[in-house]
Amino acid sequence: MIPEKRIIRRIQSGGCAIHCQDCSISQLCIPFTLNEHELDQLDNIIERKKPIQKGQTLFKAGDELKSLYAIRSGTIKSYTITEQGDEQITGFHLAGDLVGFDAIGTGHHPSFAQALETSMVCEIPFETLDDLSGKMPNLRQQMMRLMSGEIKGDQDMILLLSKKNAEERLAAFIYNLSRRFAQRGFSPREFRLTMTRGDIGNYLGLTVETISRLLGRFQKSGMLAVKGKYITIENSDLLAQLAGQARNVA
């Protein structure tokens, strides 16, 4: 029997809410390591919004930090605007990722977050989450793990841009996407790129022409099969080697 409070929350959120206990990506998100009682407490503070359409923003640079956002489905890109007025993409966030950590230090978002496709998110009021984490050691530890993962990702990106050539950058990007899809229960070998080649080039510091040329080269070498936005990894060993990784992706 479903508890009365949970029934009320389902009705208030449109009758179709997926709760933390039932979410297929909870192992990548805040609920991981929490017991049933802690999950219920976390679930009570989460707001589940209607789908975010492609092009819509979760927040803009300069906005006050009010909530963190856990992505349930879809893809969100984060970006800043340079002094010259150009967009600089700083990350692509998939289901299970949390967006907004970089605003905790100052209390204001330093970047924009925009949907690359129709996406679903869970909005988590930060002040309430912060208060709850002070009472729940497991929650606090998981928050620290997630923040640590963000820092590690930033370090990897710095290394990628400073040490690798164009071919290695793109291979590492595809390898990383493959690994992230695998973590979410999707095929690590066949997937669709939700970002444009221009977005990929912007993120990697390469031109659109270079991205297209390299994808063609990867296809000719038998490493990938490319059809529009769809990627099939044909030779995972070669991709891992070019990406500077020792382990296979598929």
Swiss-Prot record:
Gene Ontology cellular-component terms listed: cytosol
Region Activating region 2B: start-end pairs: 123-124
Region ranges (Activating region 3A): 60-61
Main location: cytoplasm
DNA-binding feature ranges: 197-216
Reported cofactor(s): [4Fe-4S] cluster
Region (Dimerization): 140-159
Alphabetized UniProt keyword annotations: 4Fe-4S, Activator, Cytoplasm, DNA-binding, Iron, Iron-sulfur, Metal-binding, Repressor, Transcription, Transcription regulation
Entry keyword annotation includes Aminoacyl-tRNA synthetase: no
Chain ranges of the HTH crp-type domain: 164-237
Cofactor note: Binds 1 [4Fe-4S] cluster per subunit.
Residue ranges, annotated region (Activating region 2A): 47-50
Positions of region (Activating region 3D): 112
Region named Activating region 1A: 71-75
Keyword Mitochondrion in annotation: no
Subcellular localization: Cytoplasm
Region (Activating region 2C): 127-128
Start and end residues of each stretch annotated as Activating region 3B: 81
InterPro entries the record matches: cNMP-bd_dom, cNMP-bd_dom_sf, Env_Response_Regulators, HTH_CRP, RmlC-like_jellyroll, Tscrpt_reg_HTH_Crp-type_CS, WH-like_DNA-bd_sf, WH_DNA-bd_sf
Pfam families: cNMP_binding, HTH_Crp_2
Superkingdom, taxonomy of origin: Bacteria
Role description: Global transcription factor that controls the expression of over 100 target genes in response to anoxia. It facilitates the adaptation to anaerobic growth conditions by regulating the expression of gene products that are involved in anaerobic energy metabolism. When the terminal electron acceptor, O(2), is no longer available, it represses the synthesis of enzymes involved in aerobic respiration and increases the synthesis of enzymes required for anaerobic respiration.
NCBIfam families, per the entry: PRK11161.1
Identification of the protein by name: Fumarate nitrate reduction regulatory protein
Gene transcribed to yield this protein: fnr
